[in-house]
Amino acid sequence: MGELLSETADGVIVNVRAAPRSSRAGLDGMVGDALKVRIRSAPVDGKANKELIEVLADAFGLPKSAVEFKSGETSKTKRLLLRGVTKETILSRL
């Protein structure tokens, strides 16, 4: 999948490994070259993806509209664009 963070003109693309059906929601360290994010929802009808966007937006102080899927919507391994932030901002909050 490449590196954890890729800076673009629009923001930063983050590699994420989703852990659905977790007992708690939030960031949970690294798994290989991806950020592990725990989410409570099951991966049914897009509920887990919606919660994933909420968790990332909250963790990095962004509005939900600033978090967008680039790939992997039906996979545990995903790439999301975080608009309006830099690599340094994200790394400082990990």
Region annotations inferred by a language model:
Residues 1-54, 59-64, 68-73, 78-94:
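Contiguous, often N-terminal, cationic amphipathic patches that form binding interfaces
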